[in-house]
Amino acid sequence: MQAICSSEESLYRPEAVRWRQRMEMMKPLGDTVVLLPCSMKKPYSNSKSHQKFRKLTRSFQELIVTSPFGICPRELENTFPIQSYDVSTTGSWSSDEVEESGKLIAKYCEGKNIVANLAGGYLESLEAFVDDFTNVCVDGRPTSNDSLYNLRMELKNHQRVNRREKTLHELRSIARYQFGEDGDRFIADNVKTKGMYHKRILSDGTQIALLNKDYGLYRLNLAGGEILKDLGIHIVNIDFDLQTNTVFAPGIEKADHSILPNDEVVVVRDNTAVGVGRAVMTGREMEECNNGIGVKLKHRLKK
């Protein structure tokens, strides 16, 4: 699915507004944040410009400035809808676009060293809300040899982040985006990943989720559902024994009101995670509806 975002009105599309709201929860890793412009090609890392940037910036916290979504930490670039939207990258921004991105930049980078390689509206959004930063861009061309040289030399003055810490931070950022502010607790210190494309997320050797590269989100296993249950996140309570992979709304006693359609949820009975799957309704609708499917299960506890 591709999200078409080609005008200023796109700022107020529900998916763009929801993304910016979730970006307010995100936290950077390390002492330095490197700000980069977005690219037409998605995910950004596949673009020629970002391949040049990444040779210099991959060991730092990277933050991509974009509209209408505001900002995108590098670790979320594969996440829907940011990985599939279509938008002009001319660099000419409206005042509303400058404001929406600028506010998020200021909040995300608070207390951090900021190294920017920006021009045009991207730079305007930074200048409007942040006073202390270093911009290495020359002649409005972030990919020029001079700009890249300046970026390389400036980053020599800043501390890189540890690879293991970076991996954990990436996994926790995705969990925070998907499950809310406490979501990063879904990823324990001992978590390991296996797989080149879709990544299996393992805790103590047990798979808790699959990180789906196509959407950049976790697909839960039952063990992961048990973790979510203990965290009190995305819970759907039922009062019957599961016999199929479909949970109908009339059998749902209570549901987390933060749940939206297509969210990953854990189905709980008698304080035990008995199933995990995808929400079809909002949590409130699950409680109020007298018919219809509430959850489609991917895994369930079988006796």
Which role fits each region the language model picked out?
Residues Q61-S84:
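Short connector loops at secondary-structure junctions
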Residues A3, G121-K166:
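Peripheral docking tails and interdomain loops at the edges
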